[in-house]
Amino acid sequence: MSLFRGSGVALVTPFTEEKDVNYEELGRLIEFQIENGTDAIIICGTTGEPVTMSEEERLSVISYTVEKTAGRVPVIAGSGGNCTENVVSFSKKAQLFGADGLLVVTPYYNKATQNGLYEHYKVVAMAVDIPIVLYNVPSRTGVNFLPDTAARMGNDI
C-alpha cells in the first residue's frame, strides 16, 4: 500500500433541484481541482453528504469520479459508518469501483471504547487492499480516536 502525499480536496456532492446527483457539476468540480493542482480527490466524505445518499448513489459517485479523474490523481472514497460489517461491505465495493483509498470516519453515536475503535479499523483495514485514512472528527462523532490507539494500529497493521 502506498501513502498519499500532498493536498487532497474533499468535494461537495452537487445535487439538482430534484435531489439527484448533478454529475455535470461534479465533473466541473473535479476538473477545476485537478487543473489547479490538487494531489487527490476525496469523494463522499462529510462535505459530500454521503448520509443523504443511497448506497447505489454513493457507488455511482465513486465510479464517476474514478472515471473522470482517469488516473490523474488518486480518488479517496468515504466509506465510514457505525456498523463494521456494513463499512467492510461498502469498502470492498468502493475498492472494486476503483477507489485508490478509503476515508473511514470514526464510528459515531455509539461512543465505542478505544479498543472497540481499534478493532473496527483493524477489521476494515484487513478486508481491503487499498490504504485507509482514519477520519477522526470528534466534534461530529462524539468520540476521539486517541494518539496512543493510532500508534498501536500503526505498529500492528
Language-model features, listed with the residues they occupy:
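Active-site beta->alpha loop and helix N-cap motifs at the rims of alpha/beta catalytic domains
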Residues: S2-V9, P14-N144, A150
